[in-house]
Structures are given as structure tokens and as C-alpha cells.
Amino acid sequence: AFPARGTGKGTIRFNDTAGSMAKDSAATAAAVVRELTDKDISDYDLHINVIGGGNIDGPSAGCAITAAILSAVEKIPLRQDYAVTGEVSLSGEVKPVGGVAEKAFGARQAGLKGILLPEENRKDLDETMQGLEIIPVKTMKDVLDRMLVRD
């Protein structure tokens, strides 16, 4: 996130790996961040860059995108040892997503300590995720309380 060249002239740019649903998640994330921080997101140029070469689409990255935007705007780093998944509603609620078992398996394979996931998805994981902390969340506030690294 960079200050825009003029008040209210900010943009949100997502690299070409994102499909339309992921771009919608970014717009929702910006609205939720505005509500949580009381900062006008249109005063920032936001560049969301998904690395790794694969295309993404769907709402699953909503929590991650929201946390990343808030982190950039507030200049508060995020933990790098936990994965996060979940759709975010305009009211900041974390909604269930698909593929949670695969995402948790990937987090464990990557050596992460844990995964934050929608509370409604907790039932989708069995006890085979030994060694991975499973943290169910209901709201973006829950996500940020766990993910932001505050002094």
C-alpha cells in the first residue's frame, strides 16, 4: 500500500493471476479494512501480488487479502507461520469455504504451525492434521487478533 498521488485517487490492482471472484474479494477486503481502521482506502494505491505462477479464483483468499491490506495500510506486520483461509462478508464475518482439508495439508507440508479457518469448516478436518494447530475464527477481528504482530 502506498499513499495515492491525490486524495481519493487510489486504486486497487491485482496481478493477472486473479480471477473475477478473487478480485471481488479484494474489493470486499478494502471495505472491511475501511470499517476496521476508519481510513479511507481510496487514499491508497493497493497492489495485490499473488506469487507462485498459479491462477487463483474464488472467495477463499478473502481473509488473507483483508489481513494483508490492513497490515500494509496500518504498517503492522503479519505472522508468517500460520495459514489463513475463509471468505469475508462486508460485515467482517468469516464464511466457510471449500477444500479446507487440502489447504490444511498444504500448510502442514509447508512447515507452518497452524491454520486459521472459518468456524463452520472445523468439522471438515479430522485428527489427521497432527502437528498443525487448527484455529477456528468467526470474524476478521478474530483473524487479526491472531495474525497481526503487535509490539
Which residues make up each language-model segment?
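Peripheral, non-AAA+ core regions of ATP-driven protein-machinery
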Residues: 1-151
